[in-house]
Amino acid sequence: AYDQNREYLGCMKGSRIVGLLDGKSEEELCRWTDSLALEPVVRKVSARLPYRFVRLLLPSDSIALGELSFYTEEGRIGNVRIITPMRATGRNEVPGMITDGLGATGYRGRVAERLVDIDLGKEYMVSHIGMTSYLKTQLFCPDEFELRYWNNGWKTVERKQADHKGYLVFEKVPRGALLMLKNCRWKGKTAERIFTYEKGDVKWE
């Protein structure tokens, strides 16, 4: 998984995002000159005009993203849609996972034209753009996973079995808590991952 993740992190190096007017590039909003970081990165944008449609220009025909987010000075733009057809290469993934607000989901695929058009829903003056890396899931069926939180010791939230989706959803999780995901089949410290979760982003410790 390490070599694959390194490949996914480098996949987006050289990507550019441009604002579109009448289907044509009007101005460059953001350029990602380096490989993506493991943690989400949000960059400031100096847009001259408001845009409804923006275009992600890829360095190759491959895309691998956990999340792509757009912001105004008032906050994150919701209901963002990918409108370019893509061919998935990850299991059970759809393009909407790039803009669903959940850093734990993601999408890996091929885009023959090396461009992805994105609909923000209406015109916005974009002030920031964020990217979250795509990482290979380690949640394989039929492994069971237990979510715990720290409160003067590790307390169990819930135990769930992984399925074909590649991610798990837990409910009634304490906000702002230090969390741990434990693979109940594995032994030793490698079976445990400590993290925090805030505003859709998983931050591994």
Give names to the regions the model predicted.
Residues 33-36, 158-162:
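Short beta-strand segments within Ig-like beta-sandwich modules, predominantly Fibronectin type-III
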Residues 51-55, 178:
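Short, conserved beta-strand segments of beta-strand-rich sandwich/propeller modules, principally
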Residues 133-134, 163:
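Extended charged/polar low-complexity repeat regions
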Residues 175-182:
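C-terminal beta-strand-rich structural cap/linker in extracellular carbohydrate-active enzymes
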Residues 1-50, 60-128, 134-141, 171, ...:
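Disordered, acidic Ser/Thr/Pro-rich linker "stalks" and the adjacent N-terminal cap
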Residues 149-150:
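C-terminal end-helix/capping segment
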